[in-house]
UniProtKB/Swiss-Prot annotation:
This is ATP synthase subunit b. Belongs to the ATPase B chain family. GO terms for molecular function: proton-transporting ATP synthase activity, rotational mechanism; proton-transporting ATPase activity, rotational mechanism. HAMAP family: ATP_synth_b_bprime. The chain crosses the membrane at residues 7-27. Its main location: membrane.
């Protein structure tokens, strides 16, 4: 192997170049790479934090939706209950009114029956008096007596 001055000169230039790169170029390059790695790590951490916050927000939204659904269902149930109570009250009022009308009609019918009976009693009394008058005016004959009774039956 042939070692000459060019080889040593190249070695000196190489070490000088290496020292310049190590002293002036390498530290800013490493610093830039470290900053870039830190930015990437911070970005990933921020993304994870954002993802966690998004999941938390989604959970809160789901919880709020569930509460809204529950509240809506409760309101619907309350409205249905109020409607049922109102319907029951209307039915009770209608039944009470119907019972009152029926009672009034029964009382009126009872009064009409009573009036009709009184009227019939008066008419029967008048007819009985007439029949007795006619029987007393005529002589007692079985055939005439039967005819008068038949005539009274027809008038009643």
């Amino acid at each position: 192997m042939n070692l000459n001055a060019t080889f040593f000169a190249q070695m000196v230039v190489f070490f000088i170049l290496w020292w310049v790169v190590a002293k002036f170029i390498w530290p800013p390059l490493v610093k830039a790479l470290d900053e870039r790695a830190k930015k990437i790590a911070d970005g990933l951490a921020a993304a994870e934090k954002g993802k966690a916050e998004l999941e938390l927000a989604n959970k809160r939204v789901d919880q709020a939706m569930a509460e809204a659904r529950t509240e809506g269902a409760q309101r619907v149930a309350d409205a249905e209950k109020r409607a049922q109570l109102t319907a029951d009250e209307i039915k009770q009022n209608a039944q009470a009114e119907a019972a009152r009308i029926i009672a009034q009609a029964k009382a009126e019918a009872e009064q009409q029956v009573t009036r009709a009976r009184e009227s019939l009693r008066d008419q029967v009394a008048v007819l009985a008096v007439k029949g007795a008058e006619q029987i007393l005016k005529r002589e007692v004959n079985a055939q005439v007596h039967a005819d008068l009774l038949n005539q009274l039956k027809a008038e009643l």
